Amino acid sequence: MAKRVLITGAAGFLGSHLCDKFIANGFQVIGMDNLITGDLKNIEHLFGLENFEFHHHDVTKFVHIGGDLDYILHFASPASPIDYLKIPIQTLKVGSLGTHNLLGLAKEKNARILIASTSEVYGDPLVHPQSEDYYGNVNAIG
């Protein structure tokens, strides 16, 4: 039986490519996106495939997935400083409440979870690209 993976932010740039990769590797993929910044055009080629299902859902609301679940890849989040200014509350909620909901789902399903971050945590970096040990150049008071 194929492993099942939930990919949040599935209609975004990274999420859609992850859906493609996991399907190509024989996984049963459950894509989830609220489509605030994601676009169905990124995953429409997957509709109708036996090993793909899409849930139009906001992870800041309770998340229920029936059956077994092996992995959760949490990539849901507005991904641009422009979006952060336009929808600041939603951005904060998906990173906090959305992560909380998905951690609860991972616990319920005994699934492994990967939570994506963003280069924005480095602030305005002094070096490019940033290595894993780069401390960042973040102004803690804004």
Say what each PLM segment does.
Residues M1-G142:
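N-terminal Rossmann-like NAD(P)+-binding domain of SDR-like oxidoreductases, especially those catalyzing
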